[in-house]
Amino acid sequence: NVLAGLKSAIVAYSGGVDSSYLMDVANQTLGSKSLAVMSFSPSVAEDDRNDAINLAKNKNWNYKIINTLEMDDENYVKNDINRCFFCKHELYGQLVELSNQLGFDWVLNGSNLDDKGDYRPGMNAAKLHKVRSPLIEAEFTKEDIRYYAKKRNLRSWDRPASPCLSSRLPY
């Protein structure tokens, strides 16, 4: 268990299967030293936000909601091929700041081994902010995560990918 060596962690939590599974394991491993942080912005569908909040409440996770301001970044708004970098840069910047304020040691995301094969500029933002990807470290694929999420009775185990609303617009 990659998380066993951590003292505390903030999980970038969207309510999708990857971050839900990661948060569930973090909660089991770190207890009150884990915090799910959800980002609210115009890029996130309201149904996705509500589902994420409901899951966090039902699982009794510590959670916090922040508002990200990627829409204020002209680099994001111009909608080029690196749009996701600027969104994740905003998110991870806020999460690192929050972790420093609250005394958490790490910021984690739910990236998995399958994500490494895709074009993911957001992974560069994670690297820049020293965000860890424990599911990659543990060599978990999406299929692995769905399997273990189902065993943990996470409602999101078979949820289809739900990328942000901005990703539905071509570059």
Over which residues does each language-model region extend?
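Mid-to-C-terminal catalytic subdomains of enzymes
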Residues: 139-171
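ATP-dependent adenylation/nucleotidyltransferase module used to activate substrates
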Residues: 1-151
